[in-house]
Amino acid sequence: MWKSRRAQLCLFSVLLAFLPSASSLNGDSKYMVLVPSQLYTETPEKICLHLYHLNETVTVTASLVSQTGRRNLFDELVVDKDLFQCVSFIIPTLNSPDEEEFLYVDIKGPTHEFSKRNAVLVKNKESVVFVQTDKPVYKPGQSVKFRVVSMDKTLRPLNELLPLAYIEDPKKNRIMQWRDIKTENGLKQMSFSLAAEPIQGPYKIVVHKQSGVKEEHSFTVMEFVLPRFNVDLKVPNAISVNDEVLQVTVCGKYTYGKPVPGQVKISICHETEAGCKEVNSKLDNNGCSTQEVNITELQSKKRNYEVQLFHVNATVTEEGTGLEFNGYGTTKIERITNKLIFLKADSHFRHGIPFFVKVRLVDIKGDPIPNERVFIKAQVLGYTSATTTDQHGLAKFSIDTAGFSGSSLHIKVNHKGKDSCYFFYCMEERYASAEHVAYAVYSLSKSYIYLVKETSSILPCNQIHTVQAHFILKGDLGVLKELVFYYLVMAQGSIIQTGNHTHQVEPGEAPVKGNFDLEIPVEFSMAPMAKMLIYTILPDGEVIADSVNFEIEKCLRNKVDLSFSSSQSLPASQTRLQVTASPQSLCGLRAVDQSVLLLKPEDELSPSWIYNLPGMQHNKFIPSSSLSEDREDCILYSSWVAEKHTDWVPHGREKDVYRYVEDMDLKAFTNLKIKLPKICFDSAPMSGPRGKFDLAFSSEVSGTLQKGSSKRPQPEEPPREDPPPKDPLAETIRKYFPETWVWDIVTVNSTGVAEVEMTVPDTITEWKAGALCLSNDTGLGLSSVVPLQAFQPFFVEVSLPYSVVRGEAFMLKATVMNYLPTSMRMSVQLEASPDFTAVPVGDDHDSYCLSANGRHTSSWLVTPKSLGNVNFSVSVEAQQSSEPCGSEVATVPETGRKDTVVKVLIVEPEGIKQEHTFNSLFCASDAEISEKMSLVLPPTVVKDSARAHFSVMGDILSSAIKNTQNLLHMPYGCGEQNMVLFAPNIYVLKYLDKTQQLTQKIKTKALGFLRAGYQRELNYKHKDGSYSAFGDQNGEREGNTWLTAFVLKSFAQARAFIFIDESHITHAFTWLSQQQKDNGCFRSSGSLFHNDIKHPVVSKALSCLESSWKTIEQGRNANFVYTKALMAYAFALAGNQDKRNEILKSLDEEAIKEDNSIHWERPQKPRKSEHNLYKPQASSVEVEMNAYVVLARLTAQPAPSPEDLTLSRSTIMWLTKQQNSNGGFSSTQDTVVALDALSKYGAVTFSRRQKTSLVTIQSTGSFSQKFQVENSNCLLLQQVPLPDIPGDYTISVSGEGCVYAQTTLRYNMHLEKQQSAFALRVQTVPLTCNNPKGHNSFQISLEISYTGSRPASNMVIADVKMLSGFIPLKPTVKKLERLEHISRTEVSNNNVLLYLDQVTNQTLAFSFIIQQDISVRNLQPAIVKVYDYYETDEVAYAEYSSPCSSDKQNV
């Protein structure tokens, strides 16, 4: 196809070459037509016509010619003798984003004919789109909020339909997608929730425009703790190689602006030298420290580098907490310690006119150096000079170019003289020098015009800028009476302004010279850069010109102001945010905690940022073909000499008018002299840039015009550059700490004002607020960033452990900080509670003085008395008192005189947690049915730890629906386990939809869980499209066949509900296909840590299944129960009813029928503990195979028979008894398959209740509770605590319909030695308290081996609970993942979880470190639990204590 297109282009180019392109001129008529080199569709564009000395009426025609034909732009009849006028036209939309086309300009009259073409780029009008997020960095599990903004190039809002937007994770997985997003008044707000364990790193929001152009915005996902304070490090940008001291200033400031007390460590390192210099100091009262660091030993004088660096690091450690934050900086070591900067030196010079140079001499800090000699040399001219810098470091020179005929001027300026140190060998100080090259402006007559750019500053909008023009005209001017200068101003690739100036020529004046001023209005449309071209035409047809660029203020028409009612507010107080903008503007507001921006700085929304957006950039058009303009013949050298009477020949580097026009991004159609003449010798063109044209023509003729060319132009370098008063004694209880406070859209009223009342969050910080507003009249406006300090004169911080064990005691500490400049008398109080006892430590609780900018800590020795969550409320209040504080009178602040902090502590019982669940499915039909239940406790139960509750549900899936993200009391840390967070939501949605019970609330919740599970599962994807339990782990693991098939199936089902990138399904399917053998079976690949489902019949290939069934049928081995169940379901899915029936019949012979239920058990079960009071829950594989039997019966074709439903119900009765308290089962895969079976059974048998069901539970004592179940509350989980444990209860059900009853019993039991499937040994290092380190930090060492009935366990979880007040040292835990047998580690609030692939009889040993966070007294032992993930009855317990747990010293 490409070759065909190239051939068409080639033929088209050849045909175009035969179209009229020569000029036929009459008399002195002159033509100059200027048009932008890039034209935009659906936008008014201008072509400027300049015709004069016409002696007849002519018609000017402009048209575009492309492969699709010719489009006429305009026909203009010109009757005037002289004309300078711009004509507007509009080009219709293209079918492609852009096209290179030929623009033809034809001028025809009775005796005139002029035709010329040039290549231009026609582009469809493009919108400007960008994305703003509510913050730059997110934690796992947080919601990413963002808004899409759409505008045209004038920055006015668009109601644009954007076809596609998506979020891409660091592995380029598309994790969320939206289609057909419609912006309203230029704005669309959207959000997306991150998974609890997403891939961490840089994410992208990608938005596609209708043209196919993509706009991207990045954000970061990472685990972080917001910095409490900022470290500001100041070092010089550069120092001399001879400097011996480096001044370093470090300041620590809290986010609310107050100084940080503490220490600072400064480290200075040379980038190429070993070793560093360190200095320690204390921060002063302002939170700062300035140090003069001797760096002599770090300096080097012999290095092969022009510039080297010092890397400076400052670590500030907060007093009291030990928190550390860093600041970084670099300082250059330069041997050129002074610099010469050209302030004025044009890029081009004019022969015969002085060339002015102005330079500034500055030192290494950028400060001007006065009274120093500066030398200048222009070697080609033989010009040398010297002068002394003035008080501003300036030196000025004027270079005479009279008699100079060269094409370039090389200028060098020096400070002092020659260097004693050359090249890069040494690091001694060198003297400053600078060079500049200027090229000649071409004019055969030596006539010139020159525009003076008086200032290098940025031009402000809405003002008049005066441009001064100087000119000198030589040569034969004849009887010229007046001279007209024409000018154009361009911005963003379009002609913005035009005008002219007439100069009267005095008779006999020669040469003609003078100057004049042009007043240019600076408009919004000219930003960020405007270009001005001025030219005039001499009588002989020569054109002289000049141009100048202006940097324009990046201004916005819509003036937006944002303000808070006060710049400082108390936490939890009311404030008002006011926005002023153009009337009816739509404004997006944002306010972010400054701590977030300290953690991850971002580019601030500003006019500069807007004008640098890709959609605002004007790209220079470079034609893809050498046929972009008509060929021109060269002039023979002999003719040149005869005509011009000179043997001087242009060199080719001079700047002619053609290049001035080209630099303006204009195309010129003219019969005037605007180009350097091309001189030929012996009919051959001169060598040089333009001499290559003929060769280029022959080699590139096939590429004349390109539609949607891939050779895109490069962007130009951007220019350098009050609420009602509150009771001041109102108490502040701080509990709301968002990272983004304001993220909202408001509409400004007709007077241009919008006000929003809001509550200040409880975070003591500085909030950074901003607004962007869009108006149909004035476009986009941005406010400056407005701070609000959420601050109170004093506040209290409370520290306590995450949890303690009953019987332990800990020190609760409350630190009060005073940030007023005066002293206060304070009282601090811990609110009394029956849940704990608190003994004050010290005598300062009633009243004490707190000095200005001081802090004070009060302590209580606390012993909890109740189990569960215990609240601690600490209040501090400034008191009115006549008693002085030292020599000062104690003051009381007007507002914020009391601060209260409430924190929660978990108090746990000692021992091992146990849970038992008793489930019953009652299906009543008028007659009452009942069941007795006994709750008993073991003799080793921990006192007061037992609790139980009874639940009633009207739907078989009620419990699972309520707990879809917490179905198991187990971790979910691998790819297979994550699917239990994903797949059940599909079954729930399908079931509720089919039974017409799906509410919007449940749907929203389930869709959120599906999206989170989808994100998490992508963590475990391999590059080849497969999946494994722990991902590829840098290529060390291969994909797992079973898990890949499961993910493929689940993703395919989830497509009906959420976005799933189709590539993930395609890649998984392709990988699975590659694993299939010739016989239809699949190669078993990768590790699956559930040994009981590692049978080869995972294949869905029927030929493989047929062969497997024959083997099983012949063997009659009971080991194949699981296999039969799975095969029955597989044949049912494949539609092979005969095979399904045959296998189900075989299974019926092995079924266990008891208690009105039917189920199947596997042989060779692991032995059960003799100490079990209750029948244990069925194993994972047994639940799974029974669920497969139900699924096989329900997948009958065309529908399940009454017998299928009856038998399924009997198995469902057994399955429901295996559910845990959250609606899940034993493990992950059994939960997924069983919930699938329950949902399908429920959907098939669902019917609306005709009568209410009445459920009653009563004890042998006085307790009795009734529940009603009806259609309106079928999904409601009704619950009541049970008072008598131990105790006997009776459950009775009457009415009509099925109800699901569940009793959950929980208690703790003391650890006792018993037979288990694992040998577990735990000890601490050091073992005793002899080592002082044992108080605060020690190592936990574990040894594990498998002693069960199988050769090896399944995947094993080691759950290590932390001692109260201790936390794990995370790096030492993470390091365990390097061990071969540990695939993953997790650190939660109070536990460390270790995932072991499997455990054999070979002992595995590993250890990590824990350290004390808060001191706890009477420290109780902590439990370590090791269990088989899929055989949860295989479990072992051990306990450990602190080496110093028996230490009786005070805490």
From Swiss-Prot:
The keyword Disulfide bond applies. Disulfide bonds join 48-86, 251-276, 269-288, 461-555, 587-773, 634-680, 849-885, 923-1274, 1081-1104, 1298-1444. Glycans are attached at residues 55, 294, 313, 500, 749, 776, 871, 1401. Residues 1-27 form the signal peptide. Plasma. Residues 677-734 are annotated as: Bait region. It is found in: Secreted. It comes from the Eukaryota. InterPro entries: A-macroglobulin_rcpt-bd, A-macroglobulin_rcpt-bd_sf, A2M/Complement_sys, A2M_N_BRD, A2M_TED, Alpha-macroglob_thiol-ester_cl, Alpha-macroglobulin_TED, Ig-like_fold. Keywords: Bait region, Disulfide bond, Glycoprotein, Protease inhibitor, Secreted, Serine protease inhibitor, Signal, Thioester bond. Residues 713-728 have a biased composition (Basic and acidic residues). Residues 703-728 are annotated as: Disordered. This is Murinoglobulin-2. The gene is Mug2.
